[in-house]
């Protein structure tokens, strides 16, 4: 019997995960707590069932994630029983890096990019799973499934290995590593249909709800805690919003929506003509912003 579209994607991702677990000495899964990470975690549990996942999950905590994301992370880790590593850049924490005071570019570089590189060096990981997909953004569209990184964790799009069909090159020298993207060929719609099919638990922020937001240059920013400074005369508005992508709350824009169930989200996706990452402030720091970040070691 022929496999469905989602079954083909699932089989491809599981094969990649098993291959990485067999070929690399010390792999890790980057866990950002979003919908793609939740699908990645579900696939990993399937890939190695009934055994436990044979590698840890790593969350690079910027100290500015939505509070619901952290609550979800801790609950899922406890329920599923996987090894969870949480890393915060100690230098960034010491000087109190903030997206409000220091700007999105500096905050992202210190707390995300440098924080990730610190964690990868600390534990000596030679392969790191990520949930990036090619349909998300143009620099990710040209990234390999096995994305080679040099000893400084930098990505050079001109220095990548050919990938013929489903054959991948896992050879690295000491200090080098591979970022592995099992969801490369999935789309945002595929992700939501798979979440619905498999009944995967996810952060409630993806569902529409009345939330306090402020309009900053056309981007709806949710007031998640008392650390967010309001501008003079600015008053949070209660709007029915949801998030298509999750990150640091001051840098993540909400979309007005009434989609409060998975079926409604899927219906919304079928009509959508915009990228989910339009709400990511960090993607608009400068032209080619995401590619520049990836060259420096970003996810």
UniProtKB/Swiss-Prot annotation:
Reactions the enzyme catalyzes: sulfate + ATP + H(+) = adenosine 5'-phosphosulfate + diphosphate
InterPro entries listed in its UniProt record: PAPS_reduct_dom (IPR002500), Rossmann-like_a/b/a_fold (IPR014729), SO4_adenylTrfase_ssu (IPR011784), Sulfate_adenylyltrnsfr_sub2 (IPR050128)
The EC number(s) this enzyme carries: 2.7.7.4
The organism's place on the tree of life at top rank: Bacteria
Keyword set includes ATP-binding: yes
Molecular-function GO terms, alphabetical: ATP binding; sulfate adenylyltransferase (ATP) activity
Entry's Gene Ontology BP terms: hydrogen sulfide biosynthetic process; sulfate assimilation
Keyword Nucleotidyltransferase: yes
UniProtKB keywords: ATP-binding, Nucleotide-binding, Nucleotidyltransferase, Transferase
CDD domains (UniProt xref): Sulfate_adenylyltransferase_2
Pfam families: PAPS_reduct
Pathway the protein contributes to: Sulfur metabolism; hydrogen sulfide biosynthesis; sulfite from sulfate: step 1/3
Region (Disordered): 276-299
Assembly and oligomerization: Heterodimer composed of CysD, the smaller subunit, and CysN.
Family label: Belongs to the PAPS reductase family. CysD subfamily.
UniProt xrefs under PANTHER family: SULFATE ADENYLYLTRANSFERASE SUBUNIT 2 (PTHR43196:SF1)
Function: With CysN forms the ATP sulfurylase (ATPS) that catalyzes the adenylation of sulfate producing adenosine 5'-phosphosulfate (APS) and diphosphate, the first enzymatic step in sulfur assimilation pathway. APS synthesis involves the formation of a high-energy phosphoric-sulfuric acid anhydride bond driven by GTP hydrolysis by CysN coupled to ATP hydrolysis by CysD.
Name used for this protein in its record: Sulfate adenylyltransferase subunit 2
Organism in which the protein naturally occurs: Pseudoalteromonas translucida (strain TAC 125)
Originating gene: cysD
């Amino acid at each position: 019997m022929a496999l469905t579209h989602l079954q083909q994607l699932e089989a491809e991702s599981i094969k990649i995960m098993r291959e990485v677990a067999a070929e690399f000495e010390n792999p890790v899964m980057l866990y950002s707590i979003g919908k793609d990470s939740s699908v990645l975690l579900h696939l990993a549990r399937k890939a190695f069932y009934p055994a436990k996942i044979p590698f840890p999950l790593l969350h690079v905590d910027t100290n500015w994630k939505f509070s619901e994301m952290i609550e979800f992370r801790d609950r899922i880790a406890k329920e599923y029983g996987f090894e969870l590593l949480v890393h915060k850049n100690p230098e960034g924490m010491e000087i109190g890096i903030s997206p409000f005071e220091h700007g999105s570019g500096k905050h992202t570089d210190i707390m995300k990019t440098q924080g990730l590189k610190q964690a990868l060096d600390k534990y000596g990981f030679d392969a790191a799973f990520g949930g990036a997909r090619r349909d998300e953004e143009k620099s990710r569209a040209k990234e390999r499934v096995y994305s080679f990184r040099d000893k400084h964790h930098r990505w050079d799009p001109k220095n990548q290995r050919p990938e013929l069909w489903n054959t991948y090159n896992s050879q690295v020298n000491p200090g080098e590593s591979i970022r592995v993207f099992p969801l490369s060929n999935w789309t945002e719609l595929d992700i939501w249909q798979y979440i619905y099919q498999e009944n995967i638990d996810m952060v409630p922020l993806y569902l529409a709800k009345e939330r306090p937001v402020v309009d900053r240059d056309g981007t709806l920013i949710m007031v998640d805690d008392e650390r967010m400074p309001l501008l003079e005369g600015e008053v949070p508005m209660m709007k029915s919003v949801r998030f298509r992508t999750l990150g640091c709350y001051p840098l993540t824009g909400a979309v007005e929506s009434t989609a409060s169930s998975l079926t409604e989200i899927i219906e919304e996706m079928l009509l959508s003509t915009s990228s989910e990452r339009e709400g990511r402030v960090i993607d608009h720091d400068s032209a080619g912003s995401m590619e520049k970040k990836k060259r420096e070691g970003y996810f």
